[in-house]
Amino acid sequence: MSKNLEKLPNTIWILAAGLLCVGAGQSIVFITIPPIARDLGLNEIQIGSIFATSALAWMILSPIWGSLSDSVGRKKIVIVGLLGFAVSLILFSFTISLGQRELLTGSLLFLLLVAARVLNGIFGSATRPSSGGWVADISSTESRSRAFARLDSGFSMGRILGPAVAGLLLLVSYTAPFFFFATGAFIVIIFVTFQKSPAKFSSKETIKKLSMFDSRVWPFLIVSAGFGISNAALVQTSSFFFQDVITPSSDNYIALASIGFMLSALGVLNGQLLIADRLQTSPGSLVKLGVILNFFALTGYAFSTSLVEVYICLFFYGLGGGMLGPGISSSLSLSVGKEYQGAAGGFLGMVIPVGHVISPLVSMPLYMLSPSLPYLLGASLMFFAMIFIFTNKRHKWIRDKNYREDRNLEVFENSQ
């Protein structure tokens, strides 16, 4: 490698640890709550409502928290986000415990579970945009994709560790995994407290509010939303795909699907920490390569008929997603001015859950028509994303690295 790696501040790893706790907490909820809630007497519609209300709150509040971090400072919003996330996990766990003891039942139990998850959506949505703004503040334009790759690797690692740790702690109690990662969030808060927050952006001029329809913003949100829908369709139907198509004669289809998603997560980490971070791949190249890989991986997945084929496709799908995530984050960060870093991250946090809201309405009916259709839908979205990024002027601006000449994008002074 011809150029030396620029040393990035350790603060990024601390912020990544916070996202690890958030990612682990989210994955634990997705895995454990459906069977637990069913045991508590809740039906499928109620269980779906618990998830949907949280996602809706996340979508609404994420851009608000991002803008607030621009004006009141990153550290305050990061701490508020982690604190609210930890408290919501504890309240959720406590409500489940009361339900298992039959001290809460029926509608009251359901409403309290919804309230706890809404609290998670309200405050948990603060962590990613404020952390992303912080990372942008303390990284140069040349190292921006590396910095975001490290930050996003925390959430990815949480998605891996969450189910693994939950599998062990569930032997202790149903609520132990929630308390474990809530405690982890409290510990991260302590470390964040001792980090020197970047200087707030100040200007004698009135700063115009950033719009998600700004030409510097929406081209990256479009690609992110397409990836989110593709990813949600894959995640929400793959267990059925393994059961119906790949291993129809096996009773271990859930375990086999879990192995596939572990391989996908391994691909994500390779995309983030090897290709984006270690190899210093530029943001524009990360987006381009990520979309292309996802297109071929989803197409291959749709026509797979064996475990080997599916596992290969899932690994390369994860690899593409691991490049696309930090590629979009760093591209959007470089596309807007330094006074809009939190707001831009907030918009990105708003569109990421879109897939989990839209996909159930589309992917399940498509799967009923043909098991391959949800993945062909995702491949189609990635195909159109390829055309878009090669024709859109702002994506070309990023690929040509014109942000190097934009004096408005100078990094904040790093006092680490």
Indicate residue ranges for each PLM-predicted region:
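Hydrophobic core of transmembrane alpha-helices in multi-pass small-molecule transporters
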Residues: 20, 101-126, 225, 309-323
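Intracellular juxtamembrane helix-capping segments at the cytosolic ends
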Residues: 33, 126-139, 323-336
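Helix-loop boundary and gating motifs at the non-cytosolic
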Residues: 6-55, 219, 223, 228-247
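Cytoplasmic helix-loop-helix junction between adjacent transmembrane helices
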Residues: 116-157
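C-terminal transmembrane helical hairpin of 12-TM major facilitator-type secondary transporters
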Residues: 283-328
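Central cavity-lining transmembrane alpha-helices of secondary-active solute carriers
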Residues: 49-67, 259-274
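Helix-to-loop junctions at the C-terminal end of transmembrane segments
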Residues: 61-74, 270-283, 367
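C-terminal ends and interior cores of transmembrane alpha-helices
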Residues: 83-106, 293-305
